[in-house]
Curated annotation (Swiss-Prot):
It is found in: Cell membrane. It comes from Streptococcus pneumoniae serotype 4 (strain ATCC BAA-334 / TIGR4). Residues 6-238 form the ABC transporter domain. The keyword Secreted does not apply. Belongs to the ABC transporter superfamily. Spermidine/putrescine importer (TC 3.A.1.11.1) family. Keywords: ATP-binding, Cell membrane, Membrane, Nucleotide-binding, Translocase, Transport. It is an enzyme of class 7 (translocase). Pfam families: ABC_tran, TOBE_2. InterPro entries: AAA+_ATPase, ABC_SmlMolc_Importer, ABC_transporter-like_ATP-bd, ABC_transporter-like_CS, Mo/tungstate-bd_C_term_dom, P-loop_NTPase, PotA-like, Transp-assoc_OB_typ2. The lineage of its organism: Bacteria, Bacillati, Bacillota, Bacilli, Lactobacillales. This is Spermidine/putrescine import ATP-binding protein PotA.
Length: 385
């Protein structure tokens, strides 16, 4: 990993008036030029982290580092970060130009340079020609662009975004996701984005921190977190999931619903109780006799791109299926899936334990592969003789 631009070392936050611990020993490192997302429900602590980076809140314990320098005691205006708030925090009595130029005027930048830089950033956010437009006459999406332009005009090392898209309608929010991601990649600035919207996080991020109750419960790429949730909370919070109790018989073999299935996971104890996750889109509808499982369709909703089908197996387990194929309520269908569609979660495993287990398991597999290669090479030499 490159030298981190931002680092949290054992950071906690307690609100003394209520004695509420909203952050619990947070540790992470952020690289320069990436798009990070803090994802969690309301009250998970994600906005608290953002406010501590910005200097709007003090950490109770721990160190906050920016480029290797401790910044706990450095005031907000001296930190090379800029925040875009959910409310945008624009000045209603100023036009677009004056709002965007405001940070430069505080630094007493030359008038000609201000005009040049404002024109550049307004072009970046597709607001050319809006310089004299009143803030009050802008749409929600246009106000969002003004707030982003103001955030990047000083070319900060880090831009913090606190649920900036939540007030927009669905179509505009989706458009802004593309625009924000493209802008971040073009500028090469580190973005730290806060949201409770899982699809938003998956679509935009290089790296996601999933938060719950003041803790980071899992971090990783969007694909890693979606495909390999570490626990029940992550599996249900990130997308839809079918979760069932199971037993890991041995490496690559799991039992659930009274049957044994091939899997791709390993590194657990023989006959260890686990939770089995299968995503709704990974289930394929077949004839009952051709399916690995048989279920009875209970309800069906059309979601536009697919049907969302709820069905129950003979043990009473509920199954959600996403399919482009329409089912009939009351009919029995088969469900088929591949070994790689089965995700295994160890009970009560932390992210540190998960990473250590996977690392140890990979090392063992590599050693076994090396031993097999050595034996094969030895046989080849013997055959030559």
């Amino acid at each position: 990993m490159k030298k981190p631009i931002i680092e949290f070392k054992n950071v906690s936050k307690v609100f003394e008036d209520s004695n509420t611990k909203v952050l619990k020993d947070i540790n992470f490192e952020l690289e320069e030029g990436k798009f990070y997302t803090l994802l969690g429900a309301s009250g998970s602590g994600k906005s608290t982290i953002l406010n501590i980076i910005a200097g709007l809140l003090d950490a109770t314990t721990g160190d906050i580092m920016l480029d290797g320098v401790r910044i706990n005691d450095i005031p907000t205006n001296k930190r090379d970060v800029h925040t875009v708030f959910q409310s945008y925090a624009l000045f209603p009595h100023m036009n677009v130009f004056e709002n965007v130029a405001f940070p430069l005027r505080l630094r007493k930048i030359d008038k000609k340079e201000i005009e040049q830089r404002v024109a550049e950033v307004l072009k970046m956010v597709q607001l050319e020609g809006y310089e004299k437009r009143s803030i009050r006459k802008l749409s929600g999406g246009q106000r969002q662009r003004v707030a982003i332009a103001r955030a990047i005009i000083n070319q900060p090392r880090v831009v913090l975004l606190d649920e900036p898209l939540s007030a927009l309608d669905l179509k505009l929010r989706t458009d802004m996701q593309y625009e924000l991601r493209e802008l971040q990649q073009r500028l090469g600035i580190t973005f730290v984005f806060v949201t409770h919207d899982q699809e938003e996080a998956l679509a935009m991020s290089d790296w996601i921190f999933v938060m719950n109750d003041g803790e980071i419960v899992q971090s990783g790429t969007p694909v890693d977190i979606y495909d390999e949730p570490i626990n029940h909370f992550v599996a249900t919070f990130i997308g839809e999931s079918n979760i069932l109790p199971g037993t890991m018989i041995e490496d690559y073999l799991v039992e659930f619903n009274g049957k044994r299935f091939e899997a791709v996971d390993g590194g657990m104890k023989p006959n260890e109780p686990v939770e089995v996750v299968i995503r709704p889109e990974d289930l394929r509808i077949t004839l009952p006799e051709e399916g690995k499982l048989q279920v009875k369709v209970d309800t069906q909703l059309f979601r536009g791109v697919h049907y969302e089908i709820i069905a129950y197996d003979e043990l009473g387990n509920e199954w959600m299926i996403h399919s482009t194929r329409k089912a009939i309520v009351g009919e029995e269908i088969g469900l088929d899936f591949e070994p790689e569609d089965i995700h295994i979660m160890r009970l009560n495993e932390t992210e540190e334990e998960f990473d250590a287990r996977i690392e140890e398991y990979v090392e063992i597999e590599e050693q076994e592969a090396g031993l097999i290669n050595a034996i094969e090479e030895e046989r080849d030499e013997e055959n030559k003789l």
